[in-house]
Regions:
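Intrinsically disordered, low-complexity segments enriched in serine/proline and basic residues
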Residues: 4-12
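N-terminal assembly/interaction segments in proteins that build large macromolecular machines
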Residues: 12-20, 25-335
């Protein structure tokens, strides 16, 4: 019993105890409804309804609060799996590619996770955010009472695994269109900026083929004009060291060595620059991507320029956590 003053009962004590006794009973139908609304577990829903006196809205907030706390605990785990997705505007002139990471490939294949990634892509397509911090602080389109970051935390609580919106890139082309391509079920996503005065099926097919080229051969640049002098000098230093470490080449005159370096740089640029690469579908095995684009332009009476591209690969640059299942279970049980 609660006390007031010198051991006497508080005048409010009886009221509080009466309210505790008459708290609304939680029914199975209420638990079912809350589960459908939130995706939370049965016992969690039952507790939320009990704690909020059966108020459904407050119960949802209660679960969100608990979910956010759970998400904070999960945030220490590495999210290196996941999927990449793309979305193109109705007029075809703007497109976005996003990467959302999860901890396991199992969750990456989950329908709820995939649906959430598509919603992130919709958000990113409409976003004017200059960086990820600004994007995460934006209001969530489907529920402006939440930020993008808060909606992510809610999804983490529902799905039960740490997730991260790692990055997005939006490309716009007012004088043509942006093509998109997804490879291997979301492992790789590509956007291609195509400037053209003719837009038809043949030009769209060309853009898709170029996107597939990018996905397969992973170029670093669109053309040589994009290659920085720093990159070239760095590669020259590596080639120079290779020559000096080769007894057969180290003894050659400096002029010959420099000629060898220039030749190897030229060859490397053809491999890392998209338009200089050999087109993967070239019938003669020699046609460059640039030559392929020009052939399509000529056949359609068009002027076509591949201005730039974006290529995302799931988890690239991230460390993947290797931990066996037994160890994970032991950790969960506090062993």
């Amino acid at each position: 019993m609660c006390q007031h003053g010198k051991g006497f009962p508080s005048p409010y004590c009886y009221v509080n105890e009466y309210q505790e006794v008459t708290r609304m009973a939680v029914t199975a139908a209420m638990v079912k409804e809350l589960r459908e609304m939130t995706g939370a577990g049965m016992m969690d829903c039952k507790k939320a309804l009990a704690e909020t006196d059966g108020d459904m809205d407050k119960a949802v907030e209660f679960l969100r609060e608990k979910g956010l706390a759970g998400a904070a605990k999960k945030a220490g785990r590495i999210a290196a799996e996941g999927i990449v997705d793309t979305l193109v505007s109705e007029d075809g002139k703007t497109a976005v590619v996003v990467e959302v990471n999860s901890e396991t490939d199992f969750v990456a294949k989950n329908e709820k996770f995939q649906t959430y990634v598509k919603e992130v892509a919709k958000q990113a397509l409409k976003s004017d955010a200059a960086d990820m911090d600004a994007f995460m602080a934006e209001k969530w389109n489907d529920d402006p009472s939440l930020t993008v970051a808060e909606e992510l935390s809610s999804q983490i609580a529902i799905i039960g695994e740490n997730m991260k919106i790692r990055r997005f890139n939006k490309v716009s082309e007012p004088n043509g269109f942006v093509a998109s391509y997804i490879h291997a079920g979301g492992k790789i996503g590509v956007l291609v900026d195509v400037e053209t005065d003719v837009v038809n099926d043949a030009v769209h097919e060309m853009a898709k083929n170029v996107a597939m080229q990018i996905a397969a051969l992973k170029p670093a640049f669109t053309n040589e004009a994009e290659v920085s002098q720093e990159y070239i000098e760095h590669e020259k230093e590596i080639l120079r060291a290779q020559i000096e470490n080769d007894p057969k080449e180290a003894s050659k005159p400096d002029k010959v060595k420099e000629g060898m370096i220039q030749g190897r740089i030229k060859k490397e640029l053809k491999e890392v620059c998209l338009l200089d690469q050999v087109y993967v579908k070239a019938e003669d095995g020699k046609q460059s991507v640039q030559a392929y684009v020009e052939s399509v332009a000529k056949a359609n009476g068009a002027k076509i320029t591949i201005k730039k591209f974006v290529r995302f690969e799931t988890g690239e640059g991230l460390e993947k956590k290797n931990e066996d299942f037994a160890a994970e279970v032991a950790k969960q049980m506090g062993a």
